Swiss-Prot record:
InterPro entries: CstA, CstA_N. This is Peptide transporter CstA. The gene is cstA. It comes from Mycobacterium tuberculosis (strain ATCC 25618 / H37Rv). Belongs to the peptide transporter carbon starvation (CstA) (TC 2.A.114) family. It holds the Pfam family CstA.
Amino acid sequence: MAAPTPSNRIEERSGHASCVRADADLPPVAILGRSPITLRHKIFFVAVAVIGALAWTVVAFFRNEPVNAVWIVVAAGCTYIIGFRFYARLIEMKVVRPRDDHATPAEILDDGTDYVPTDRRVVFGHHFAAIAGAGPLVGPVLATQMGYLPSSIWIVVGAVLAGCVQDYLVLWISVRRRGRSLGQMVRDELGATAGVAALVGIPVIITIVIAVLALVVVRALAKSPWGVFSIAMTIPIAIFMGCYLRFLRPGRVSEVSLIGIGLLLLAVVSGDWVAHTSWGAAWFSLSPVTLCWLLISYGFAASVLPVWLLLAPRDYLSTFMKVGTIALLAIGVCAAHPIIEAPAVSKFAGSGNGPVFAGSLFPFLFITIACGALSGFHALICSGTTPKMLEKEGQMRVIGYGGMMTESFVAVIALLTAAILDQHLYFTLNAPSLHTHDSAATAAKYVNGLGLTGSPVTPDHISQAAASVGEQTIVSRTGGAPTLAFGMAEMLHRVVGGVGLKAFWYHFAIMFEALFILTTVDAGTRAARFMISDALGNFGGVLRKLQNPSWRPGAWACRLVVVAAWGSILLLGVTDPLGGINTLFPLFGIANQLLAGIALTVITVVVIKKGRLKWAWIPGIPLLWDLAVTLTASWQKIFSADPSVGYWTQHAHYAAAQHAGETAFGSATNADEINDVVRNTFVQGTLSIVFVVVVVLVVVAGVIVALKTIRGRGIPLAEDDPAPSTLFAPAGLIPTAAERKLQRRLGAPASASVAAPD
């Protein structure tokens, strides 16, 4: 019998559903639902829209009275429901047009290591864990300096119209190209010049991003035996889950999930007990350098081992902790009804001289929030690990669009944890030590002089706040993570345990942050490896073999290159806190958003190439907005005459002090620190220029290719020919009645996937 082709697609309609077959002699590979929207559904969505509009009205226009945090949660939730049901559906029907009778890269290239068809629930867990890192936790906390209103609008609306769209569509074009990386797709679709720029620039950006994320993990876990023990235990638990699903009970995802959740909760609770034992404190209180080497080793192992053994189950397991904690915080908001202490729009939004970060609301609020609304890093995951695990094209909507929507909600909750804090305490936590001298008395004097609303803070108040969470001081605990932990403790102790458990919740939050961010390190390493393989393979010769995923020596070599790159920067940052990775922190947000510009450019061009010019506005509008934000921010960072904003102006001031033989200048307290600032600002300014040049080259190439395509003379679409699928799997996280019926007929575990017999 001849191999079936996509043209053999057969639809058998029954009521509001159709069974799709790739071959008449094989079982169905998909169920297409065509259920109309009933009156009950219409009433529900109208009610959601009305409630959402009311909530946004309260959030935006009630300025002269306190605003309850519940309103922001309600506004966000209603917006997500409408966005996923209607806007994501529009994109699916008009742009993506998924074909579940087409085999995905995981089915075609199934190699048991990188390409593995995986249950959609596990893929969703892996994908969410991989994309949700430091950005949605730290960015909104820092952006609270500008006020809660612009931050909440951008996090929610920006995600629905930009971030979710980017993730969904990058996943789509990668799946249609055998899971190719973003850099390779730039080369294939936009030409060699843009491709070289992307294949060189993107790995540099991703190396910086992974190193920054890893440093946040190291700082959170240093001298924290509870966190180290609990996170270490997730590794054997994940390996057990992977083997359980692979060999013992294939397809029993719900079963292994219950076991994994139980073991995870045991690891979290027992971590507190272990930390208070003599042997636990000795074994798990690790120095930053030791943690670096352990993290580097883990990153390499996670990228080498088969994806089903460690990466996917560990990310899936971590998702339960992530989503569970965020859900608990959301319940805490609804139960405690905390009042938002931050102003709707602060005076720092216009002045641009806030103590947390310098710069005006536009463009730096959008740069600071970063992954909470739009993230270029996500494009690497959507063209890295996720397309190589996906069972069906129909699952892309819930995983790509839904995964980013979930992360946006994480950012909303993170924003609220900072916004409900007394603003004097918020700025005490986030003001640079240059202004506070790490003293409660000096900090109180400084923040009381900022012109904040509310009662002035006293040194005793600051000391009591630190003691309530088991810390010696909370003064100048910059970076956002300590503020998030403090806000989480403030929220959770009101719901569970009272004041007596506030310190417990604070240290739990520290562990949660490390676990939350670590999953992006391992997935990012694997995604970066794919990009390095694609980039080097373009040189031809023996390097061409690197693009073959089955060539293990090449895969291992690329993994070593990636881990060595971010690992060396991580070690530099830990051993040299005034330089190294800290140099790259201000670049994190801009680089991430510039990467999103590259991804949206490729998406827009592909949509035009596929003859869907009418719908090119869907990725095109987010692209124009992202370019306006990032290029403006880059211009200011490169050319601003304000030394608190412009890299080169700051470089010139410190270089002048260096040449004058000064021993202290600005934030530098000695000559060595002055030298560090001179070096760091040079690196920052240079990388800013490089990143902008890369993005401009890609965008210009995209415009040229798009115009040629419209005129009928463009580069051909680099999409692989489809192959027929023999695998059935439900499209959504929850199977429909028709899908369940087919599953029972095929004899597979409830809601699992099943392959046609050979």
